[in-house]
């Protein structure tokens, strides 16, 4: 639980992984509500200094202020599997109009969150297709990379070999093992999160 709290502070999306983990613990490992509540309490104690700091400084209960930007970075008109972060004139104007006060970080994030949400709603097919491409690229390799050194065998073959053997391992794994099934679940949840929010590094 302490590690979970630290992970939340490092990566905001880890909250989703923790929620899934608690549900899995409850339904498959039969962990009691009391024990899960205790784990949540330890997590809250771990992150409480940061939460208190945000309440005091910006009057807001928040863990991360980069959710909107990360979502936009992976879901904007110029975004590709490996990037393409171009801020258009209208978005630049919105950013420039944000008041330079203690709420700047929150409002900056909101501008990108609103724009990313608008992009996805207005063109769901494009972003679903992009999500699928990123998912396959994170799972295997990027077949449309523009980097000249990407397709050097020493670069892509280890990643491809690891991906293929991992999938074979998943297929052949003991489906009755709750521990293995949990690891497989978290493996795919991580890929889904990164495919939705981020671009291929």
Residue ranges and their predicted role:
Residues 1-11, 21-22, 42-46, 50:
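Membrane-interface alpha helices of multi-pass inner-membrane proteins
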Residues 58-136:
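Membrane-proximal stem/loop segments at transmembrane-domain junctions that anchor or position
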Residues 29-41:
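Membrane-interfacial entry segments at the cytosolic side of transmembrane helices
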Residues 112, 118-184:
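Membrane-interface anchor segments at the N-terminal boundary of transmembrane helices
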Residues 23-31, 170-176:
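Structural signal for the C-terminal ends of transmembrane alpha-helices
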Residues 2, 13-28, 65:
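Transmembrane-embedded, aromatic-rich helix segments that form part
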Residues 2-4, 38, 44-45, 158-167, ...:
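Transmembrane alpha-helix segments characteristic
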Residues 8-13, 17, 55-58, 148-151, ...:
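Membrane-interface catalytic loops of GT-C/OST-like multi-pass glycosylation enzymes that act
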């Amino acid at each position: 639980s302490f590690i979970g709290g630290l992970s939340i502070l490092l990566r905001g999306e880890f909250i989703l992984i923790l929620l899934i983990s608690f549900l899995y613990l409850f339904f498959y490992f039969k962990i009691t509500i009391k024990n899960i509540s205790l784990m949540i309490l330890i997590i809250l104690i771990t992150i409480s200094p940061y939460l208190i700091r945000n309440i005091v400084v910006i009057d807001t209960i928040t863990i991360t202020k980069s959710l909107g930007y990360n979502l936009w970075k992976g879901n904007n008109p110029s975004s590709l599997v490996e990037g393409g972060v171009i801020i258009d004139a209208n978005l630049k104007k919105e950013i420039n109009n944000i008041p330079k006060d203690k709420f700047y970080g929150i409002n900056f994030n909101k501008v990108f969150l609103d724009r990313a949400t608008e992009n996805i709603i207005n063109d769901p097919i494009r972003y679903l297709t992009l999500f699928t491409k990123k998912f396959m690229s994170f799972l295997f390799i990027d077949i449309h990379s523009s980097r000249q050194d990407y397709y050097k065998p020493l670069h892509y073959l280890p990643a491809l070999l690891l991906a293929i053997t991992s999938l074979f391992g998943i297929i052949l794994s003991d489906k009755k093992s709750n521990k293995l099934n949990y690891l497989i679940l978290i493996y795919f949840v991580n890929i889904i999160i990164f495919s939705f929010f981020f671009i291929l590094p």
